[in-house]
Amino acid sequence: MASPAALRPSMGAIMQTCRSAATAPKVAVAVPVRALSTSAALLKRHKYPTARVTRDNSKQRGESALRKSGTRWKLSVSDEPLPEPVPREELPPIQVDENHGLWDFFYDRETVAMAPLEHTKHGRAWTVSELRKKSWDDLHRLWWVCVKERNRIATANWERTKSELGFGLAEANERDRNVKQTMRGIKHVLTERFYAWEDAVKLAEQDPEIDLSNPENPYTPSTFLEAEETAEGAEASETQSTTTEIDPTTIPSSKSQAEAPRV
C-alpha cells in the first residue's frame, strides 16, 4: 500500500491541471446577430405562408401636427405670387334680369322679409262649399296661386332665420296655415268630383242610350229617334197627297149663292 507521502505529488499535479483549466484564456467567437427593428418593413411576426399582410398603407404615418415632425418628404415650393382678392367696390356690376321668374319668390324686391303687421293682412281660407261652385280652370289657377304664396312664405322664413331677425315667424306660420287649409279644400272638392265621375261611368255602362265607345257622340236618346221618324212620315204623306190627281166632281161650284136656280 502506498504511503501518503507518495500520493501527494500526484494529487498536486491533478489540482494544478484543474486550476490551469479553470484559468484558461477565453476566445471570442463571432455569432451572427439579426437586427431587430420596430418598423413595419422589417418586423415580421408571422412566418407561416397564410399569414395576413401587416403592411402599413398610410401615407401620412409619422407626421404629427402636435410634435411638428413635418412631412416625410420635401415639398416643392414655387416663387409665383399668390393672387390677391379684388375689393368689392372694384367688381363690375352684375347684370340681373328684371323680369326673371325668381323675383316672384319675394313679396318686395327691396326687402327679404315682410314686417309682422304686413303678414297679418290676409283673409281667411276658402271653404269647401265655396270651392264646389268653382270650375276646373278656377280651381287650377287657385291651386298654383297657393303654391306661389307658400314659396314666398318659405323664402321669407329662410331669410329671417339666416339673418336672425327674430320677428314675424308666428305671423308667417299663421298665413301659411290658411293657405294649406285652402289647398286641402281644393283636394277635397276634386276628390268628390272624381267619385261622382266614377259613379256616372258605372251608370252609363248600364244605360242603353249611351255608347262609351263613341267619344264624339256617346248619347243617342231613343225619344229623339222616334220623333224624327214621325216627322219623316208626315212629310212623306204630305208629298203623296199633293201628287195624286183630284176628281173634278168633288170640286164645289164656283157660282155664288144668288145665281143658283131656285126650286
Curated annotation (Swiss-Prot):
A GO molecular-function descriptor? structural constituent of ribosome
Compositionally skewed regions (Polar residues) per UniProt: 214-223, 246-257
Q: Does this entry carry the keyword Heme?
A: no
Which terms are listed as keywords in the entry? Mitochondrion, Ribonucleoprotein, Ribosomal protein
What is any one GO biological process for this UniProt entry? mitochondrial translation
Outline the segment boundaries, as ranges, of region: Disordered. 51-92, 208-263
Which InterPro entries does this chain map to?
Answer: MRP-L47_sf, Ribosomal_uL29_mit
**Can you say where in the cell this protein is located?**
Mitochondrion
A Gene Ontology CC term for this entry? mitochondrial large ribosomal subunit
Residue spans of biased composition, Low complexity class: 233-245
The entry describes its oligomerization and partners as:
Component of the mitochondrial large ribosomal subunit (mt-LSU). Mature N.crassa 74S mitochondrial ribosomes consist of a small (37S) and a large (54S) subunit. The 37S small subunit contains a 16S ribosomal RNA (16S mt-rRNA) and 32 different proteins. The 54S large subunit contains a 23S rRNA (23S mt-rRNA) and 42 different proteins.
| Annotated protein name in UniProt | Large ribosomal subunit protein uL29m
The species this protein belongs to is Neurospora crassa (strain ATCC 24698 / 74-OR23-1A / CBS 708.71 / DSM 1257 / FGSC 987)
